[in-house]
Amino acid sequence: EELLRIEIESLQGADFDVSLTGFGEDEIADLFAGDGEKDVKDDDFDVDKALESETFVQPGDIWLLGRHRLLCGDSTKPEDVLLLMDGKKANACVTDPPYNCSYSGGTGMTIMNDKWGDSEKFCQFLLDAFKNAYENLADGAAFYCFHSDAEKCNFFNATVNAGFHYSTTCIWVKDTLVIGRMDFQMRHEPVIYAFKDTAKHKFYGDRKQT
């Protein structure tokens, strides 16, 4: 049974239609029933207490994660981005900036710079960050920016004014809708696709993507 579960799990990961195996949905569900709860051991870790503790990470700290570098810093400050890049240029930038809307999760914690209120200040905030991205990208590098429809003008203007060549807007279609206060509930997220046109841009797909 364990081997069967492993095989079906690998087929699911390969987007294979597992119904072709001859097992019905109920049989497969029974096979995986309780699998997520098995071997789960609770500990005495206090999440709330940990969140209240003073952090030892300070601005300017860089964490090395294998080949990757993670900076505690400000992407609107050129000196911070230069510190992160360490003299190198990136081949692509994928960014998901604040959407200029207040968000608070179940913990009540908020996101810094998440809500500006003033549209001009928010656009300048984006522009400062995007300019730094532009300066630290290689010639022809791609730029992807997840954003909200409500602020699409600011995101578009900041992208173009930073120097990028706007190409198109991709749509991320999500598996489920996101409940909000809007009349129509969103089930997608737009993504600006642009590139640094100081050289022919590089695209690594087969041009069949939608």
Residue ranges with predicted function:
Residues E1-T210:
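Core catalytic lobe of class I
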